[in-house]
Amino acid sequence: MTNAMKNHIITNLFRCMAVSALALGAAACSDWTETEAVEQQVQRPADQDSAFWAEYTAALREYKQSEHFLTYARLYNSPTPSASEKDYMRCLPDSLDIVSLTNADNFSRFDAEDMVTMHEKGTRVLYQVDYAARKAEFADAAALKTYLDGVIAAVAANDLDGYSFTADPLDATATASIVATLSAAKTDGQLLVYEGNPLFVAEADRAKLDYVVLDTEATTDITTLKLQVVNATGYAGIAPERLLLAAAAGAPLYDEEVVEHAAITEMAERVVSLGPLAGLAAYDIDNDYYDVERNYPLLSDAIQLLNPSK
C-alpha cells in the first residue's frame, strides 16, 4: 500500500466531485424560474477503476497480514436516524485492522453492503457484546444465553469476523458464560476480543482471548498508564503482543513533563515505548471524523505513527 495508490484514488474522487459540482451548477443556472430535481449518484472507487481497486485492496490485505502494529476502533454503526457518512464502515480509514460494531444488534442493509468493502480491504468486523453497559437487560443466565445465541447466529448470517465484549467486574458468572459461549462458537479465523481490565476475567479464561483492549481510554497521565500496563502484562499475564491500549478521540493525555497531547496519537507512541504492545484501540471516533483536509485525522496519524514504513 503506497502513498501513490492512495493519492490516485483521492484524485479520482475529487475529479468525480468536481464533475458533479459543474453539472449541478449548470442545472441550477439554466432556468431560474423552475425548480428541477437533479439525480445524484455516488460513484465508489471500485466503480471508477476496478482494476486499480483490485490492486489497491490486494496491497491492503497483504499489509494487514504482515507483522505490524494493529489499529482497532469502536463504531456505533447505522444509528436511527443517521447523522452523516461517519455512521458507516465504508468511511473508516482503509488501513484500520479491526472495527467493533457497538450497534451490531441493529445491523442494517447498509452495514451488509459495507461488509463487502471491509473484506476487500482486509478489515475484520466484530460484533460487540457490551455486557457492562447492558447488564440490566438480562434478567438471568437464561436471558443472557438466549441473547448470545442470537449474536452467534447474526455473526454467521452476516459474515462477521468474530466478537468483542465487555464485562461487569462484580458478575464473574456472566463473564465466564460469555467467554465460554463465544470462544466455543468462534470459527477458524475469527477473533474474540475483551475490552477492559483483564483481571476481571478468570485466569483460566484469559488464554481464550485473542486480544485484550486495556481500559486506558479514561487515563490522563503516563504514570497511571505505565502501572496499568504492568498490571496487565504482569499480574494478569497478558502477553504484550496480545495487548492493545485504548484512547478516546478528543481526550487529553499528559506526558511525564505534564505536557498535554491528543490521547490517540500519544497513546500510539506509548504502544511502542511501553512494549512493544499489539496496538491501539480508538474510542469515540465520531469526535475525530470532521476535518478540513481529511476524515479521521487523529486516527490516521496514529496509524502512520505506528507503521511509518508500511
Predicted regions and their residues:
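N-terminal secretory signal peptides and thylakoid transit peptides that target proteins
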Residues: N12-R15
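Residue-level marker of positions within ordered structural domains that often coincide
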Residues: E34, A104, I285
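Substrate-binding cleft of secreted/luminal carbohydrate-active enzymes
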Residues: A246-K310
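Bacterial Sec-dependent N-terminal signal peptides
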Residues: M1-I10, S20-S66
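Intrinsically disordered, low-complexity regions
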Residues: T2, K6-I10, T57, Y72, ...
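Generic hydrophobic, helix-prone segments enriched in Leu/Val/Ile
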Residues: Q48-Y63, V213, I264-R270, L299-L305
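Generic detector of solvent-exposed, compositionally biased contiguous segments
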Residues: T35-A46, A51-A54, R242-A263
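Chitinase-like catalytic core of GlcNAc-active glycosidases
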Residues: S66-E260, G275-L277, D291-E293
